[in-house]
Amino acid sequence: MVMTDPIADFLTRIRNGNMRKFDVVEAPASKIKRQIAEILKAEGYVKDVEYVEDNKQGVIRVFLKYGKNGEKVITNLKRISKPGLRVYVKSDDVPKVLNGLGTAIISTSTGVVTDKVARQTNVGGEVIAYIW
């Protein structure tokens, strides 16, 4: 069966693993998923990201992060731009998630970046997801 939205599947695997308090979540690898996973790691939402090569497309392992008392670091993860309804923003209209407490992941001409980086470099693009 063909997957219509692999990014949504990747984010859903992370969201479900987070709700069930899994240590590791695995998903089929792609370039954009790797970039999203690296942003999650850089922003402190996950512990680590590992790429495992098999003879096909590879696998991304995301090591989820929890607080001292087991509280979730990721409160919510929401897909914004979908295959049926793409959401694009200009450089002036880059959104702030929860007034700056969350992070928007944006696919720009310079690559996949956070909302903060998009604002600093004055670029717009497709809003992939919100995370807080």
UniProtKB/Swiss-Prot annotation:
PROSITE patterns: RIBOSOMAL_S8 (PS00053). It comes from the Bacteria. One of its GO terms (molecular function) is structural constituent of ribosome. Keywords: Ribonucleoprotein, Ribosomal protein, RNA-binding, rRNA-binding. HAMAP family: Ribosomal_uS8_B. One of the primary rRNA binding proteins, it binds directly to 16S rRNA central domain where it helps coordinate assembly of the platform of the 30S subunit. PANTHER family: 40S RIBOSOMAL PROTEIN S15A. This is Small ribosomal subunit protein uS8. It comes from Lactococcus lactis subsp. cremoris (strain MG1363).
